[in-house]
């Protein structure tokens, strides 16, 4: 492994000395050796790390307020239901209020399809869910 490294270093040194010898003027060889560091400096200067923003902040769009967007977070499902009730979206609030029942019915349906429970057990569980939800 070391011999491979030494061969690579020797090839790099030989290639550099051959490129320097190819120039007739000594200033030209200095130009070649300065090309890479200046290029690296230019690349670093042009790739300034800029802070990225997800939303545009144009002063022309002053009419868009944060209240117009759905940025608010709610702590619980009860807060979401209350907020929907306030906005006269009773049907959506009803769906969210019955989300547990809907989930239980879906789980029971999957269990019935896979054969883990019988039709009688499924019917009994649905009847029990309807009694508890009233």
Swiss-Prot record:
Disordered: region residues: 43-65
Signal as UniProt keyword: yes
Record motif RxLR-dEER, residues: 52-71
Signal peptide residue numbers: 1-22
Pfam families: RXLR
GO annotation, cellular component aspect: extracellular region
Disruption phenotype: Results in significantly reduced virulence on Nicotiana benthamiana.
Keyword Signal: yes
Source domain of life: Eukaryota
Location of this chain's protein in the cell: Secreted
Domain remark in the UniProt entry: The RxLR-dEER motif acts to carry the protein into the host cell cytoplasm through binding to cell surface phosphatidylinositol-3-phosphate.
Protein name: RxLR effector protein 4
Species for this entry: Phytophthora nicotianae (strain INRA-310)
Name of the encoding gene: E4
């Amino acid at each position: 492994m070391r011999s491979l490294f030494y061969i690579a270093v020797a090839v790099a040194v030989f290639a550099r000395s051959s490129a320097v010898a190819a120039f007739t003027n000594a200033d030209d060889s200095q130009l070649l050796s300065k090309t890479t560091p200046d290029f690296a400096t230019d690349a670093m200067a042009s790739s300034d790390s800029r802070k990225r923003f997800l939303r545009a902040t144009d002063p022309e769009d002053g009419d868009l307020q944060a209240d117009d967007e759905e940025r608010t977070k709610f702590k619980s499902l009860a807060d979401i239901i209350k907020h929907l009730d306030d906005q006269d979206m009773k049907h959506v609030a009803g769906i969210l209020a019955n989300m547990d029942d809907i989930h239980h019915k879906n789980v029971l349906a999957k269990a019935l399809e896979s054969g883990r429970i019988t039709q009688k057990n499924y019917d009994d569980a649905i009847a029990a869910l309807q009694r508890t939800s009233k």
